[in-house]
Regions:
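C-terminal scaffold of the Radical SAM
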Residues: 1, 21-47, 55-341
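Immediate flanking context of iron-sulfur cluster ligation sites
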Residues: 1-7
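Local cysteine-cluster metal-coordination motifs and their immediate loop/turn environment
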Residues: 8-21
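Short amphipathic alpha-helical interaction segments
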Residues: 341-353
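A short, conserved structural fragment
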Residues: 355-365
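Minor-groove-contacting beta-hairpin "wing" of winged helix-turn-helix DNA-binding domains
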Residues: 366-370
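Short, amphipathic alpha-helical interaction segments positioned at domain boundaries
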Residues: 372-387
């Protein structure tokens, strides 16, 4: 099982971000940690009663927002409380996101003492002009300093988040960003193409013509360069946007793509939990508003969460949607075990059609996207959807 905690506090909201994150709310951090621990205890009690044993967490992920904004004493209280409530595996992968502009040794001390053994830093870009366009508060020298601090504290499993297809970004600038990231010797890189989200300042500037995106050919070249350059440096692609040195693929991410049950705590956090011996999964989502979440916890008004059972058809499609994002692909044997029916019976005709189009390949009992299929993944999934 996997555990996710959402820490929605930010020093400044990035211009492209549509996540549940809030600037200027630092005064609520203590109350928020109280709420997280209360929710953790309640969920642990419920599922321990349902399963007859405590929840064992194989991975833990602190996301945001900016978890590194949490004061060290609050981080210590949170992580200590989680260990009291859950059975966290001794070899658990324990990741925290961090912003290079907010990281300091005291926070890292508390993180390591609480079990954090993997750090994901939001570098995003190398060039100051692009960081300004994104509304980031750091520069590359702060990324370098953060990496040094993390290693000095004993965290050597380091991931960097990068973004391509940005307004004003050229292919040469993207290569420069990759080179800068690689100079820091990370174990993992996440390389995301920008998706301008409605309601964000960046999307408004694009719609107004103030900013413009690279053309499709340039963005494709950026992705091709990512595959070539990272492979040359020993990185293995294990998902469309994720690359790792051997042995350093993110276990938390892999669990999500393989439909491992996960428990989410905090504002906007989602869970997908087994309610009846693998035959009835339920997805629930907490309210996204910070104060709405705190109010829910204070009043114990759990009905403000959205809760929906995952139908068998949804579960089948999610196996394809999530599995095809990975380079491993979708296993015919695993599909049969999970859903009690053959992949060929459910999707055979459509899979073979996509294979004939050069978008899927079939080998060793797995269906995988081809390189061309990665470019049109959404079209592949539309073909696989039920009519």
């Amino acid at each position: 099982m996997e555990l996710y905690l959402h820490l929605p506090f930010c020093a400044k909201k990035c211009r492209y971000c549509d996540f549940a994150s809030y600037a200027g709310q630092d005064g609520l951090m203590h109350t928020y940690v109280d709420a997280l621990l209360k929710e953790a205890a309640r969920q642990s009690s419920y599922y321990t009663g349902l399963y007859g044993h405590s929840l064992r967490m194989e991975t833990v992920f602190l996301g945001g927002g900016t978890p590194s904004l949490l004061p060290p004493e609050e981080l210590h209280r949170l992580l200590s409380g989680l260990r009291d409530i859950f059975d966290i595996a001794p070899d658990a992968e324990f990741t925290s996101e961090a912003n290079p502009g907010t990281l300091d040794p005291a926070w890292l001390d508390a993180a390591v003492a609480g079990g954090v053994n993997r750090l994901s830093l939001g570098m995003q870009a190398y060039q100051p002009s692009l960081l300004e366009t994104l509304g980031r508060i750091h520069d590359f020298t702060q990324v370098e300093a953060s990496v040094r601090m993390a290693r000095a504290e004993g965290i050597h499993n380091l991931s960097l988040d990068l973004m391509f297809g940005l307004p004003g970004q050229t292919v040469a600038m993207w290569r420069e960003t990759l080179d800068a990231a690689l100079s820091l010797s990370p174990t993992h890189l996440s390389c995301y193409g920008l998706i301008p989200e409605e309601g964000t300042p960046l999307k408004r500037d694009l719609d107004a013509g103030i900013l413009s995106l690279p053309d499709e050919e340039a963005e494709r070249q950026m992705y091709d360069d990512t595959l070539t350059i990272l492979s040359h440096h020993g990185f293995e692609q294990y998902e469309i946007s994720n690359f790792a040195l051997p042995g350093y693929a993110c276990r938390h991410n892999l669990g999500y793509w393989r439909q491992v049950p996960y428990l989410g705590l905090g504002a906007s956090a989602a869970s997908c939990m087994d309610e009846l011996n693998g035959s009835a999964y339920v997805r629930s989502t907490n309210p996204p508003g910070l104060r709405d979440y705190l109010d829910m916890m204070q009043r114990d008004s759990w009905q403000t969460r959205t809760v929906e059972p995952v139908s068998s058809n949804e579960a089948v499609f999610e196996t394809m949607m999530l599995g095809l994002r990975t380079t491993r692909g979708v296993s015919e044997d695993a599909f049969q075990r999970m859903h009690g029916q053959s992949l060929d019976v459910v999707y055979g005709e459509r899979l073979r059609m996509l294979e004939a189009q050069g978008l899927l390949r079939h080998a060793d009992g797995y269906w995988r996207l081809t390189r061309r299929g990665m470019d049109v993944q959404n079209s592949v999934l539309v073909t696989l959807m039920d009519d």
